[in-house]
Amino acid sequence: LISLILSLIVLGACIIGVAYSNTKNNARMFIDEYEKSAYAFHENELKNIMDIMKQTAESIYKTQKAKGISDEKIQEAILDKFNDLRFFDDKEGYIFVYKYDGTSVLFPTNKTQEGKNLIAVKDSNGVFLIKELIEAAKKGGGLVKYHFPKTKDGKPFPKFSYALSFEPYNWMMGTGIYVDNVEEEVAHLQKILMKIDR
């Protein structure tokens, strides 16, 4: 009888241990899936915005080109259209435009940079962000991950940007969104998991 009781106790402990382990594993899987889903959502959001912006630029180009308007005036019309656009709840999303050689054509939040070649600009981790965005655009569009300040001379935060090319003028056009909120939420969830581990 005693051996039976001991066996039942061991079995019960094993069941509890497996359930506890499964709980931790499920929690880790949830955090991983949350992170992937949040980043995928932002990537799709950026891509959709840029698809619309490219269609807008193409429409302006075709309409004005058909009227015999000069390329200089067409470029001005496209850039004027993009200049005041802001996206997302924090209004920190904007359209930036660069020539393929890295020269800034449109930088709405820092006009002093327009006309400068920024191809050599690196983020705090050594990512040549303009160069990579141009390469992504030339390949048909793509996402680049880097760190960028929210304010001039401020602390850099993780950011996703999606870039497309506008072939008539050899432009790279893009927009980005800060993703530090995702990292903060993941860190918060990991802290909760650590409490479960104790």
Can you name each region flagged by the protein language model?
Residues 103-109, 156:
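Amphipathic coiled-coil signal-relay and dimerization helices
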Residues 19-45, 192-197:
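Amphipathic alpha-helical segments and their boundaries
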